[in-house]
């Protein structure tokens, strides 16, 4: 018996002012089944129950690209998007599904996970997404990636200041970094603002909300690239987490 994802059309509409098409919903279902299958070989996620998967992987991924509940205006046609530390493909794969006119680069340092994601992209027929086995500190210093992206997504990877150091060097001027967090405090905002300023960015929005099924607290931090990032950032692999700005 196949586990069926809930459609949640009303909740999508209420929380994102958007609903998936039948084709997108079918791809979400296929993605869910592929993740369950892959979980047997790889430790991809502990979130496997249909409603929990819908809320914590699909909804959470897309809520990040819907600042203040406005999904559609967020990703311009042809946007170049990068998902850093994609893991099992979140948030990047759901975003690629709903934004077919964007190009998505999914980055992870674990080759096995990237090999799995490549198989997912093939099964889903997602031609607008590609993968990369690397680390943010490395690609942030490579000319083919530095200042090449419109949007950078990062979920559950290190401190917020480390996330800023991973994302801002990759963004074009005017680009936007989206940092997905759980809880968040005013003190954290102050230290993040200091770090972001050094990296050529500004904290544009801190969006706090609750998830629609379990009412869990979430925050998304939106950082705008307003100036060139100094050449010494990002620092070497491991340094952003060991010695935060």
Swiss-Prot record:
Its EC number is 2.1.1.-. Keywords: Cytoplasm, Methyltransferase, rRNA processing, S-adenosyl-L-methionine, Transferase. GO terms for molecular function: rRNA (guanine-N7-)-methyltransferase activity. S-adenosyl-L-methionine binds at residues 85, 90, 108-110, 136-137, 155. It comes from the Bacteria. CDD domains: AdoMet_MTases. It is an enzyme of class 2 (transferase). It is found in: Cytoplasm. InterPro entries: rRNA_ssu_MeTfrase_G (IPR003682), SAM-dependent_MTases_sf (IPR029063). One of its GO terms (cellular component) is cytosol. Pfam families: GidB. NCBIfam families: rsmG_gidB. Belongs to the methyltransferase superfamily. RNA methyltransferase RsmG family. Specifically methylates the N7 position of a guanine in 16S rRNA. This is Ribosomal RNA small subunit methyltransferase G. It comes from Trichormus variabilis (strain ATCC 29413 / PCC 7937) (Anabaena variabilis).
